[in-house]
A protein has these predicted regions:
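Phosphate-group recognition and catalysis centered on beta-loop-alpha active-site segments
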Residues: 1-245
């Protein structure tokens, strides 16, 4: 296990501190800059481009964010770097560009977006670790996907590894327990599914738990009752109430 208690220290801005009212879109350099300036940790999503370069983007398809249909894995990082996100000046950034911008100012919680299917993610874990090599700053890696977490472990990841998960049924807890047998360091859980026996047991064993995705003060209060820290969007968690941004 890797020491990961720092993940509890501050709220985590979901896909950066984005704000549609000010045309700051998710997973963009503008959103990451805004989060760093506010002192929030940053959550981001990483996909693998056609040239095996990790890029920061949530969806498998480009249409919602870039206005064109197509699988992100069919575009090179250079091609993606020319695509406007939400019609703004921001383009789809590489993980390397994002790291250069944040430069250790705040912690990073990076979710790796795997794919189903044999061989779909071959080399993905190694590509992420290669980009991270030498980065001076706090980093944690997480995924919904067992095979991604296994590959990160097998590749000798020096970073805390976490399970992204949801669910409130025993069969789901069984799958989560199986993933935790990899020796994971933290959990990111869907907060409406708390409390539950799986998370209660993991916290009792010393595993830090953050939640996703909190959008108001009620969710914040629920998180701090049943978990350790939150991943948030759409409000300023420092405020007593939770007005829209």
């Amino acid at each position: 296990m890797t020491y990961a208690t720092w993940i509890k220290d501050r709220p985590v801005a979901h896909r950066g501190y984005h704000d549609m009212n000010h045309h700051v879109w998710e997973n963009t350099l503008s959103a990451f800059s805004r989060a760093a300036e506010a002192g929030f940790a940053i959550e981001c999503d990483v996909q693998l481009a056609a040239d095996s370069v990790p890029v920061v983007f949530h969806d498998h398809d480009l249409e919602r964010l870039c206005g064109i249909k197509g699988d992100i894995r069919e575009k090179t990082s250079a091609e993606l770097g020319m695509l406007s996100v939400g019609g703004t000046k921001d383009k789809v950034p590489t993980l390397k560009q994002m790291l250069a911008l944040v430069a250790g100012k705040v912690p990073l919680v990076i979710e790796i977006k795997g794919r189903e299917g044999d061989g779909e993610d071959d080399g993905f874990a190694e590509a992420v670790l290669e980009v991270l090599e030498g980065y001076q700053g706090k980093v944690a890696l997480m995924s919904f996907d067992y095979h991604i977490l296994r590959d990160l472990k097998n590749a000798g990841s020096p970073y805390p590894l976490g399970l992204t998960a949801m669910g409130d049924k025993p069969e789901e807890f069984f799958e989560h327990d199986e993933a935790m047998q990899l020796g994971l360091d933290f959990i990111s859980y869907h907060y409406p599914h708390l409390p539950n026996t799986f998370i209660t047991a993991q916290r009792a064993s010393g595993i830090p738990v953050i939640t996703w995705t909190v959008r108001d003060a009620n969710g914040r209060e629920h998180t701090y009752k049943y978990a350790d820290q939150m991943t948030f969007e759409g409000f300023d968690p420092r405020e007593a109430s939770s007005p829209s941004l």
